[in-house]
C-alpha cells in the first residue's frame, strides 16, 4: 500500500511539472489611442490583461476586440497625480477638488464604459490614491459592480490595499513596471526579477505599455516563458486581503 502511494506521488512529480508552476500576470496599460498598437497588445500570446482608458478615441472598439480575442479587460481609470507637469492628463480625470456630484458622475460613467471589464486600475493617481474619501468612493463603486482593483502603485503611500479590504473588494498590486527604461536589457532584467519573485511568493504582476519596443520584446518572450511559470489573468491573483487591516 505504501509502495503504491509512493509510486503514485512520484508519477505526479515526474509527469506534472505544472504542479509546481508559479503565476505571472502581465498588464498592458494605456490602451485606447493607437489602434495598431492596441491590437498588437491584445494579440500578444497567452493570458495578457489589457487596461483601457475609458474615454480614449478607440477604447470601446479595442475592448470589443479584446473580448473576441479572449483577453481580460480592465478599466484604466484616470486619477489625479501629484505633479502633472510634462504629463498628459486624460479628460475626464478624477480630481480631489471636484464636488461630490461631479466626482460621482465621472466615476460611475467611467466604470460603466465597458460591459466586458473584470476590474479597475488607476491611471496615474499618485495623489488621489493617498486620499481616504476619494478612494473609498472608487472602491465602493468598484465593489458594487463586482470588479476587482489593481493598484498600479504610482505612490508608495497608496491606501488602496487597506480601503479595498475594508470594502471587501478583491485587490492586487503591481510588482514591476516593465518599460520605465525602454531598453531590451532592462526589460529582460525586469522579467527575470518577476520570475524570481513568482518562484518565491507564488505570483508576480508586471505592467507594461503599448510601445513598439515593449511589444516586440513581449511577442518573443511570451512564447518562451520558463516551464514553471504560468501566464495568468490578473483576476486569477486577486484576493480580499485579510492582512490589509491597518496597513498604509
Language model features with spans:
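Bacterial N-terminal signal peptides that target proteins for export
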Residues: 1-6
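N-terminal signal peptide c-region/cleavage motif recognized by signal peptidases
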Residues: 15-16
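Terminal interaction modules at protein C-ends
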Residues: 20-22, 191, 195, 238
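Active-site beta->alpha N-cap acidic-glycine motif
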Residues: 21-87
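Hydrophobic faces of well-ordered beta-strands that scaffold small-molecule active sites
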Residues: 24-28, 48-50, 73-77, 120-122, ...
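Substrate-binding cleft of extracellular glycoside hydrolase catalytic domains
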Residues: 66-116
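Catalytic domains of cell-wall/extracellular-matrix polysaccharide-remodeling enzymes
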Residues: 97, 101-192, 209-226
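C-terminal alpha-helical cap/extension of soluble enzyme domains
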Residues: 198-241
Amino acid at each position: 500500500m505504501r509502495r503504491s502511494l509512493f509510486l503514485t506521488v512520484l508519477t505526479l512529480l515526474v509527469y506534472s511539472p505544472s504542479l509546481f508552476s508559479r503565476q505571472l500576470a502581465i498588464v498592458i496599460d494605456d490602451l485606447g489611442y493607437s489602434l495598431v498598437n492596441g491590437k498588437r497588445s491584445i494579440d500578444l500570446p497567452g493570458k495578457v490583461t489589457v487596461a483601457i482608458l475609458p474615454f480614449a478615441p478607440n477604447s470601446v472598439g479595442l475592448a470589443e476586440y479584446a473580448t473576441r480575442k479572449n483577453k481580460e479587460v480592465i478599466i484604466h481609470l484616470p486619477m489625479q497625480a501629484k505633479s502633472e507637469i510634462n504629463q498628459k492628463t486624460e479628460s475626464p480625470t478624477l480630481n480631489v477638488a471636484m464636488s461630490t456630484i461631479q466626482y460621482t458622475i465621472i466615476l460611475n460613467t467611467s466604470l460603466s464604459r465597458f460591459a466586458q471589464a473584470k476590474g479597475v486600475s488607476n491611471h496615474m493617481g499618485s495623489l488621489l490614491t493617498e486620499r481616504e474619501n476619494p478612494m473609498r468612493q472608487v472602491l465602493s463603486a468598484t465593489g458594487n459592480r463586482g470588479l476587482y482593483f489593481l493598484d498600479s502603485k504610482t505612490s508608495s503611500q497608496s491606501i488602496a490595499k487597506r480601503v479595498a479590504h475594508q470594502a471587501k473588494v478583491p485587490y492586487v498590486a503591481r510588482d514591476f513596471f516593465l518599460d520605465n527604461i525602454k531598453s531590451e536589457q532592462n526589460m529582460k532584467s525586469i522579467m527575470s526579477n518577476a520570475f524570481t519573485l513568482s518562484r518565491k511568493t507564488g505570483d508576480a504582476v508586471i505592467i507594461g505599455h503599448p510601445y513598439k519596443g515593449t511589444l516586440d520584446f513581449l511577442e518573443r518572450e511570451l512564447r518562451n516563458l520558463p516551464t514553471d511559470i504560468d501566464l495568468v489573468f490578473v483576476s486569477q491573483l486577486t484576493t480580499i486581503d485579510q492582512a490589509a487591516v491597518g496597513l498604509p
